[in-house]
């Protein structure tokens, strides 16, 4: 925003970037519903599948990433590979390929059935009038599939960055999207203490921590300003940076 100092206009913040999952919406129920729906859809086509527990899922995920490190940031491809691994002993390899692709399409549609936190849409509308807005996400949600997408100037996923936060490529690419800005003129908002707050902080980017679950701050560096109510966000930013 713009501040008047000795008659001169000084811009403090030009760009605000946002995490998506668990920042704009509660991602846990969304992913759980998408997973349940997709598994039922698959089993109608191949019969009963041994899905295993959460530890099994994580172990399979890690095995697949060891086989192909690039899918660590291509999580859409990773999920397709997980589906294939789970059913390839039940159908032919070509059938597994088709079913996995179709299943992923079902999953990704359900994955976008989110419920925004109260106040998100109005806050983004208000902020977009004064700032450039961007998305920096490790996930595969597409902000432009939502009505609120119209408020954003760009969105960078791990697939585009070819890396994941807390590494810096997301933030470097954000600078390339808006001409003439520096990290010092950015504000990043997210829920994750490492992937969002630490990542931005170490680059000199200003941060706001979304903490709607009253989570304890456990990092070695100073706790940033936080908020839990999206309806208050424009006012908080105005107080801090105008």
List PLM regions with ranges:
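N-terminal helical cap/lid subdomain that shapes the substrate entry/recognition surface
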Residues: 9-118
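Asp-based, Mg2+/Mn2+-dependent phosphohydrolase catalytic module
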Residues: 1-16, 28, 94, 121, ...
């Amino acid at each position: 925003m713009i501040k008047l100092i000795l008659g001169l206009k000084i811009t403090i913040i030009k760009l605000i970037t946002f995490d998506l999952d668990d920042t704009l919406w509660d991602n846990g129920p969304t992913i759980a519903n998408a997973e349940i729906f997709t598994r039922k859809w698959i089993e109608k086509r191949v019969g009963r599948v041994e899905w295993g527990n959460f530890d099994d899922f994580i172990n399979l995920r890690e095995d697949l990433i060891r086989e192909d490190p690039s899918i660590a940031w291509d999580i859409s491809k990773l999920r397709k590979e997980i589906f294939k691994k789970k059913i390839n002993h039940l159908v032919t390899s070509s059938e597994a390929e088709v079913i996995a692709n179709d299943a992923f399409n079902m999953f990704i549609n359900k994955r976008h059935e989110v419920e925004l936190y109260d106040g998100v849409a109005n806050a983004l509308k208000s902020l977009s009038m004064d700032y450039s807005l961007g998305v920096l996400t490790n996930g595969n949600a597409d902000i432009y599939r939502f009505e609120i997408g119209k408020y954003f100037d760009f969105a960078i996923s791990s697939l585009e960055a070819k890396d994941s936060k807390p590494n810096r490529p997301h933030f470097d690419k954000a600078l390339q999207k808006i001409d003439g800005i520096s990290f010092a003129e950015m504000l990043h908002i997210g829920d994750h203490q490492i992937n969002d707050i630490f990542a931005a902080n170490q680059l000199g980017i200003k941060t706001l921590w979304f903490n709607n679950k009253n989570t304890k701050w456990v990092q070695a560096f100073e706790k940033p300003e936080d908020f839990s109510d999206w309806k208050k966000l424009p006012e908080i930013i105005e107080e801090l940076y105008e």
